[in-house]
A protein has these predicted regions:
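Surface-exposed interaction patch
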Residues: 17, 25-27, 70-145
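Extracellular adhesion/glycan-binding regions together with long Ser/Thr-
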Residues: 57-58, 131-184
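Short, polar/proline-rich extracytoplasmic segments that appear immediately after membrane translocation
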Residues: 2-63, 202-216
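Predominantly extracellular/luminal cell-surface or secreted proteins
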Residues: 45-47, 89-91, 122-128, 139, ...
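Short linear motifs in intrinsically disordered/low-complexity regions
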Residues: 36, 44, 51, 55, ...
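C-terminal, structured domain-capping segment
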Residues: 62-95, 164-216
Length: 216
């Protein structure tokens, strides 16, 4: 009986020791601390400053004048790639005043001016910033389409149209990688000499906005 009692006492002790052995196995603990999610950035710069301060300001233009009105570097300063949209806004034609030659040419109405119906402009992206029409370049056609370089080194005449023809948005014209530029956006103008009828635009001005949007 005494042996049986001792045996019964030994069994729980053995079980306890076995349990202690299970919980005494090797272990190691690691913790990943300070986990952080950070949003990327899209930051578009057009021209010499961010936000944009550049604009086209031309005065005293006359029939037969043609030149570059603006050259603006378009750059994605952000950490994310984006898709570029460009919009030429509504055109406002200002009469400003009617000179004697204007009246003689038949311009007797105010406040709308006639310059936007005579002056031609072209908007194009000089992707490699070479200053010439080359591979990778494109222009924004007044019908809302994008026309890419196919041949030649001179911007095609078809790139130009009357200012009044342009209000439009061109969507997704170019993918712009993070911290890279899209190229130089150039504004060209041409004031064709069509004779005495051009007098109706004397002193007139046309005003519009060009908006650049970088989308994810």
């Amino acid at each position: 009986m005494k042996k049986i009692l001792i045996s019964l006492m030994i069994i729980p002790l053995v079980l306890a020791l076995m349990g202690a052995g299970v919980y005494a196995l090797f272990s190691d603990t690691e913790a990943a601390t300070g986990n952080t999610f950070t949003a990327g950035t899209l930051n578009l710069q057009v021209g010499s400053a961010d936000p944009c301060t550049d604009k086209v300001t031309l005065s005293n233009i006359k029939p037969s004048d043609a030149n570059t009105a603006a050259t603006w570097l378009v750059k994605n300063l952000g950490s994310l790639a984006g898709s570029l949209d460009i919009t030429v806004g509504a055109i406002t034609n200002n009469e400003n005043s009617i000179t004697e030659p204007e009246a003689a040419a038949g311009d007797v109405t105010t406040p709308g001016g006639e310059l936007g119906g005579l002056l031609k402009v072209a908007f194009w992206m000089d992707a490699d910033k070479s200053g010439t029409w080359t591979s990778g370049d494109y222009y924004l056609k007044s019908d809302g389409t994008k026309v890419v370089w196919a041949s030649g080194s001179t911007l095609p005449a078809a790139a130009y149209d009357l200012v009044n023809s342009y209000p439009h948005t061109w969507s997704g014209v170019q993918a712009v990688a993070a911290t890279t530029d899209a190229g130089n956006f150039r504004v060209e103008y041409d004031f064709p000499d069509s004779g005495a009828g051009d007098n109706v635009a004397q002193g007139d001005s046309c005003v519009f906005d060009i908006t650049f949007v970088l989308n994810q």
